[in-house]
């Protein structure tokens, strides 16, 4: 790891770098309040000639960097860096000083190369990149109502409705102080993830789903990150919904770590241990999660199961708030759906009847007793002590 104090103009400027916002990072989320706070800080710096401190910018080099250009994958500071570039684009688009316009465009926003991969100095996240490139290229007719465009327009309005000296504002931005932190992890990507966890622990709290996504998508290859994101993670989120990721991973782990149980608040730590102890590749885990998510969507009603009998009983289980059954249902769906569908119908109906009777004697919290029953059945199925059929499940429930 290497840390250096720098001016932002040294960090962004030059002809040998492209900044990459990886898919494991949040999308661009700065709102008007964030932008106005930065704007006021920059105006104060311009008026007082005191450099504004922008904070740390943490990154690591991609192994796919070319001979002429280095790809720097951002771990922290991407929201601030993106916003600074939006302000620079707004200055470029409102100044009448052609020298300043060209200086900003050619040294801070774009690279003078034919290779499209390196043309724009910042590659925003996959969902933001088109809007960001349109702003940098001046294709304003192509812009939608993205957050990037909203903030760009805010800065345009500030510049066109005031008597701000464009050159002085640019100088204030260029003079901003940062700490440039190059993680230099080589192949030790655990360092990247550890730093990510620590720097984000002081900001907006990340969900277990955020942390797991970051863990699975972190790579020293931008190409692999994008493949993992678009071919696996996005599809998982589409199947079950972003807000359901933590409980989905929890139920997945109840299967993978059976018979061990753990608190839902420990899901990220248990996931890291599972990835390490079972010696699974990230691609293998993503593929398995995608497979399970195709069934889990029925359990959270993101999509109604095409089998009407199963769908009816799933609705009853959901109505009874029996989420403790989800891990067992997920395992049953994964092993039986489309192969033993008639038998699965019978078992899901059995579970719906069981939980209804269970609610007559227990409250809706489920509790350790129900979790224990479910855990024992999962464990016996995995160990092949019982089979995936109605009679075996009935016997286990009857003797619980």
Regions picked out by a protein language model, each given a short descriptive name:
Residues 2-261:
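Glycine- and hydrophobic-rich flexible loops that cap the catalytic core of alpha/beta enzyme folds
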